[in-house]
Amino acid sequence: MTLIELEQIFKKKGYDMYNFARGIDNRPVQISRERKSVGAESTFISNVYFDSDELNEHIKDVVNDVCKRLDYINKCGKTITIKIKYADFKQVTKRITLKSPIYTYEDIFKNTNILIEKVKNKEKQIRLIGVTMSNLLECEKEEYHNISLFDKL
């Protein structure tokens, strides 16, 4: 239908319907839900094996991205999920829920590697690695202060 026909039938709503049907919607996006997870993933240019240096570098990059995203929204997570997609496009996920929330690179990297060890298959090549933090909570990050032994002398 033409714009004129829609406006004759539906009045002002006809104009909106005409634009919506063409993917045009200039209303501001209202985000009304709270984020439930933060994740990142990386696809390899060519498939790699579990014991490759390239996999380890991608894991570091993905965990770093997750940490930055957690920091940006000031959240910590209790559940870590890894996703591994193999060269044959079969996919496996593994997760662990911790007693306390974490947010540091070291903690997320350590737990990611624990999960990877549980699904490791040295004979299969990997196409993609992903890490997601969920069960998010407001983060009260500890401030670390350097304490000198000589302050009290």
Map each language-model feature to its residues:
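DNA-contacting surface of Y-family translesion DNA polymerases
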Residues: M1-I126, L136-K152
